[in-house]
Amino acid sequence: MEQAPEDQGPQREPYNDWTLELLEELKNEAVRHFPRIWLHSLGQHIYETYGDTWTGVEALIRILQQLLFIHFRIGCRHSRIGIIQQRRTRNGASKS
């Protein structure tokens, strides 16, 4: 008969602690890339929609992750990650 493998991995933090730590890291990163008024408005929207609940925390984490992913994917001035098109001269040579 099959049995589930024993948990041999490292001990994990409690979910609530890990979630709050992740939210704090995302907020710190978001402040570096977006206007504070946008982030404040997002926080107000989440609070009005979900109140002070874990569902609201999870929604805020998900939205911040999506915003940062798209921001980096499009091209952030602070990052080398992204798809910013470089101008090219004839013969495909780039300006230096």
Curated annotation (Swiss-Prot):
Post-translational modification: Phosphorylated on several residues by host. These phosphorylations regulate VPR activity for the nuclear import of the HIV-1 pre-integration complex.
Annotated Gene Ontology cellular component terms: host cell; host cell nucleus; host extracellular space; virion component
Gene3D superfamilies in the record: 6.10.210.10, VpR/VpX protein, C-terminal domain
Region annotation Homooligomerization: where it falls in the sequence: 1-42
InterPro entries hit by this protein: RetroV_VpR/X (IPR000012)
Localization annotation: Virion; Host nucleus; Host extracellular space
Record PTM Phosphoserine, positions in chain: S79, S94, S96
Any one Gene Ontology BP term: regulation of DNA-templated transcription
Keyword line: Activator, AIDS, Apoptosis, Cell cycle, Host G2/M cell cycle arrest by virus, Host nucleus, Host-virus interaction, Ion channel, Ion transport, Modulation of host cell cycle by virus, Phosphoprotein, Transcription, Transcription regulation, Transport, Viral penetration into host nucleus, Virion, Virus entry into host cell
Pfam families: VPR
Family to which the UniProt record says this protein belongs: Belongs to the HIV-1 VPR protein family.
Record's function text: During virus replication, may deplete host UNG protein, and incude G2-M cell cycle arrest. Acts by targeting specific host proteins for degradation by the 26S proteasome, through association with the cellular CUL4A-DDB1 E3 ligase complex by direct interaction with host VPRPB/DCAF-1. Cell cycle arrest reportedly occurs within hours of infection and is not blocked by antiviral agents, suggesting that it is initiated by the VPR carried into the virion. Additionally, VPR induces apoptosis in a cell cycle dependent manner suggesting that these two effects are mechanistically linked.
Misc note: HIV-1 lineages are divided in three main groups, M (for Major), O (for Outlier), and N (for New, or Non-M, Non-O). The vast majority of strains found worldwide belong to the group M. Group O seems to be endemic to and largely confined to Cameroon and neighboring countries in West Central Africa, where these viruses represent a small minority of HIV-1 strains. The group N is represented by a limited number of isolates from Cameroonian persons. The group M is further subdivided in 9 clades or subtypes (A to D, F to H, J and K).
Subunit structure of this chain's protein: Homooligomer, may form homodimer. Interacts with p6-gag region of the Pr55 Gag precursor protein through a (Leu-X-X)4 motif near the C-terminus of the P6gag protein. Interacts with host UNG. May interact with host RAD23A/HHR23A. Interacts with host VPRBP/DCAF1, leading to hijack the CUL4A-RBX1-DDB1-DCAF1/VPRBP complex, mediating ubiquitination of host proteins such as TERT and ZGPAT and arrest of the cell cycle in G2 phase.
Protein name: Protein Vpr
